[in-house]
Amino acid sequence: MWIKELELKHYRNYDQLLASFSSGLNVFIGNNAQGKTNFLEAIYFLSLTRSQRTRADKELIHFDHSTVSLTGKIQRISGTVDLEINLSDKGRVTKINALKQAKLSDYIGTMMVVLFAPEDLQLVKGAPSLRRKFIDIDLGQIKPVYLSELSHYNHVLKQRNSYLKSAQQIDAAFLAVLDEQLASYGARVMEHRIDFINALEKEANTHHQAISNGLESLSLSYQSSVVFDKKTNIYQQFLHQLEKNHQKDFFRKNTSVGPHRDDLAFYINGMNANFASQGQHRSLILSLKMAEVSLMKALTGDNPILLLDDVMSELDNTRQTKLLETVIKENVQTFITTTSLDHLSQLPEGIRIFHVTKGTVQIDSDIH
């Protein structure tokens, strides 16, 4: 899939903008604080109904307006789709082909994106919540039903934690009802995650071996707070551990086990990647991003859109080459932001150049 056209109204520093794109590489050049990242953020927001930079929708609204509108024309294998998101003080409205979508899971996945930004280099050593978010964003696009099950899980988790904080003593019967619901939704969330990580590991290892010239293997491990011996009995084991932890959870006023506490670990040649070099970290993250692209295509039959936000300068020529080879081979529409073309020595022919200045975007040329 690829985005043919994007229209922004009152989005950050873009008052009015209409732009059309190449189905291949699109490069946005401009000084810092001109709106390059805002532009990629808008594509990300149109895909996932959320910003990668802020949770406050009001920050997305142009300073002298009260509403935001984003519309995009998406070319999928199945045909052209029109997406629209409107933000106001009354909330947000999402539409597909002018039809309002009642559920997030009905909208997300229509336009898939993979974002590679400098912050992703913290994925290995950062907080576990970053890695859970990484899993959730990819899975939500590949399997929209996952978002529904995760939402149900989080709702019951909130109920259980609220009860634990307010109760003077344990009502075993009431807690048993919440435990059963939490274990049911949580088991399905974990099953989806495990399947995803197993599939991602195969793709990521293939890319990592290519980047390292066969010298390094990459493996991933889903680190669950629920102890289980096989995937088919997660529900029973989760339920048992919830019941076993009643007193501990009551004392701590929160739920001590479940997918909300799970993590993801990375290993290079069997060694924990926390101890890897900076170069190995870059290769690992690059391998993951390329694996996201190839896995989404394998599981959905369509390519995602790749957003590279000021990361090419973080990669040496070898890693740039590997990334762009994958983009060209997989025929992935790609958006690159940069302050200069000087360090983009490996750009292929056929790219479209845009200049970004103070919230305006001007097409430079198509290079053949």
Curated annotation (Swiss-Prot):
**Cellular component annotations (GO), alphabetically ordered:** cytoplasm
HAMAP family the record matches? RecF
Name under which the protein is recorded: DNA replication and repair protein RecF
Q: Which organism is it from?
A: Streptococcus pyogenes serotype M3 (strain ATCC BAA-595 / MGAS315)
SUPFAM superfamilies in alphabetical order: P-loop containing nucleoside triphosphate hydrolases (SSF52540)
Lineage, top-rank taxon, reads Bacteria
Could you tell me the keywords of this UniProt record? Answer: ATP-binding, Cytoplasm, DNA damage, DNA repair, DNA replication, DNA-binding, Nucleotide-binding, SOS response
Annotated Pfam families: SMC_N
Q: Name one GO molecular function term.
A: ATP binding
**Protein role:** The RecF protein is involved in DNA metabolism; it is required for DNA replication and normal SOS inducibility. RecF binds preferentially to single-stranded, linear DNA. It also seems to bind ATP.
InterPro entries listed in its UniProt record: DNA-binding_RecF, DNA-binding_RecF_CS, P-loop_NTPase, RecF/RecN/SMC_N, RecF_2
